[in-house]
């Protein structure tokens, strides 16, 4: 049955087991599809996360903030408060376009394959052919002779786009001979304390132990008309 047509049946079951505290109707705003105008259905799905605390990413990011110059100074407080309270970073998305999340998962226990040789092989293929190779190549090409593709599920998730943007310091500053890492300044609007400044800080603090910038300048906005 449709999820919205079984509400009362679910309530009856809860009541039957003595688990229903109250039943009534509330008028409130609710997200609807911009296409069909139908109410959205929320569904929990398995995702991939980067822990903020298991390997001290939060603390590394906070120390990076303290070592960064902010213009104006209140930008430091804004970004710091976000890092202090943010949850683990969900880096997977279910889309038909984007950069694939290159993970193989053991079928027998659901654990990801952790093998630096496989990771390097995937990275080499990505660099030569682009990330679409993940979707077009046979899994055995990435796994090599050591593993059987029959033992793994190949993920079809993509990496969330803010991880993409947060990685630009690596493939721009570290790849071009006319540029140096870290950047002297990142310059953007105040919305990027939650966006580019934020994701760049986490990605770089996790992989390089510091922010990818020496300073951050937050500019204002101009509205035309």
What are these regions (language model features)?
Residues 1-115:
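Residue patterns forming the tRNA-binding/recognition surfaces of aminoacyl-tRNA synthetases
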Residues 6, 81-82, 86-88, 92-225:
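Conserved active-site neighborhood of enzyme catalytic/cofactor-binding cores
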